[in-house]
Amino acid sequence: LPAPSHADRTSSPRLVVVALASCGIAVSLMQTIVMPLLPEFPRLLNTTPTNAAWLVTANLIAGAVCAPVLGRLGDMFGKRRMLLVALAVMVAGSMLGAVSDDFLVVLVARALQGAAMGVVPLGISIMRDELPEEKVGSGIALMSSTLGAGGAIGLPLTGVVAENLSWHWLFGGAAVLGVVELVAIWRLVPESPVRTGGRFDLIGAVGLSAALVCLLLAVTQGNGWGWTSPAILGLFGGSMLVFLGWGVYELRLPRRAGGSTRQPLVDLRVSARPQVLLTNIASVLIGFAMFTSFMVSAQIFQAPTDSGYGFGMSLTRSGMALLPGGLMMIAFSPVTAGLSRRRGPRTTFLVGAAVLATANLVRTVAPHQLVVVVVTIAVTSIGAAFAYGAIPAMIMRAVPLSETAAANSLNALARSVGTSTCSAVVAAVTTASVVQVAGVTLPTAGAYAAVFAIGSLAAVCAFVVAALIPRDAGIDAGLPLSETGQDRIRIAP
């Protein structure tokens, strides 16, 4: 079938937005479909609980590596092309997991599914290149909101499947969803004409991948291996050294586009601009603040009532209790886009950070009543919708058109580091203070209160960092993206 071209578009902007935004749901599902079943995978795959945890870790590391690589390749050779590649790899991983009971095979499948992390930044960059100016903000806000909505949908869906069908259906369903996404992108989304050309920075890709693997291994395994163990300290030290060497190498590469010039994987000169650097730091913190609720709310819903804070829900019911939060993210995406259009995306981000800080603080001190928990989860999702909807616009208004995919991918990586760090902190805090309830070891109510207090502090820090971003028309006023970014584009023939 012939692919649509930039010169001969047949899709309406609305269809392009729907096709791309639905990819956010696929990404969220890839990250969440195995989480509720982690306690069962040691039995299902004949492995240990420690090994089963790698089903999450492998997906996270693979996604962190793929995102910046696919982003740069998208800027060089076509964003839609790389988006299709990422979806194809995700489908291959899902099909592999659907047909195997071997732990190592399923582990490889989860790593392949991690390629989905590169889909969202590529899709956001396509929106900037292809949509009319008046549609860009709302499209980005919707796509960002589907990240949370997908997680909220994935948890009850996982519960239904786990309680009624084989776990293989989770991977099979992901494969079917991926194929649908592939067809939709192929038929409805035109290729962006914005290219940088040049040669791919393979050495930079290997260096960044090595540094990320060391860093994320240390963050995700620190609680199990011991934060002061030689392995964890060595991984942290190794990641710092590799990052340093990688940075020196990247800065030495020329920035000229086209021809046979090797393009740096990440343009550190652009990334070091205060607007970009501080936005990425704020993204790490906001990712942490948002993920606290996601990490522990399902545990609280499923904890026995004798714990003093739990509600004794099944996997499916706990997922349904989380669903309103995900729907709030989608419902508020037009509101976030409108606020960014009128007041600028930084104002939208500051509102989101303030809402997240307040919601986490309420979770710290509020009574353990179901209505309070469900409402605060929904409010947390609203705050995340404001913050996540603003971040891509803040990034894209500070970078050249030719750098959008790479810059968005680096920002997606920053948010991933925030959520990964949150996961490690939650594990450390909830295992440090436990109580025995009916012979089962559970975190104390104080441990969960501490988690939410830390999440509130992270949101406050994100607010402060965002407030320090230099005032600039691109982030403080509702100007079209084309009037704020610095054009360094080449139109592909």
Regions found by a protein language model. Give the residues of each.
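Membrane-interface helix termini in secondary transporters
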Residues: 40, 68-72, 76, 160, ...
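Conserved MFS/SLC helix-loop-helix module at the cytosolic interface between two early adjacent transmembrane helices
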Residues: 65-101
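Paired small-residue
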Residues: 89-96, 104-112, 371-379
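Cytoplasmic helix-loop-helix junction between adjacent transmembrane helices
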Residues: 112-145
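C-terminal membrane-cytosol helix-exit motif in multi-pass small-molecule transporters
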Residues: 175-193, 209-221, 239-256, 462-470
